[in-house]
Amino acid sequence: MSDYTIRSGDRAVFLAGLRELTDFLTANPTVLVPRRPSFAVLVDADDSDTRRAGMESAASALGVPVADLGMGYFDARREFGPISYLVIGVPPEDRQ
């Protein structure tokens, strides 16, 4: 059992929403789209080493490395065209 928590949503609902958005934007070409949209999954843990372990687990599935941003923050991202999929580790004192 891990000491970290990965805050993610319902996979099927998320994918259905992406398909719905794609269909809507395709059917409505006058609707503006964001230049650099992103999706983020947060990793929570009380200490930096455990947070890093959670990040490594999530980043492995994406096939990307974890970047140590300093001060307890970690980042892993994969780009899909202009869209970023991020996993972010945030220190406990900065979580809201």
Task: List each model region and its residues.
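Actinobacteria-biased recognition of intrinsically disordered, low-complexity terminal regions
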Residues: 1-9, 96
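Contiguous, amphipathic alpha-helical segments that mediate oligomerization or scaffolding
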Residues: 6-37
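Generic hydrophobic, helix-prone segments enriched in Leu/Val/Ile
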Residues: 21, 55-60, 85-87
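Short glycine-rich, basic-tinged beta-strand/loop micro-motifs
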Residues: 31-52
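Short, hydrophobic/π-rich interface segment
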Residues: 45-71
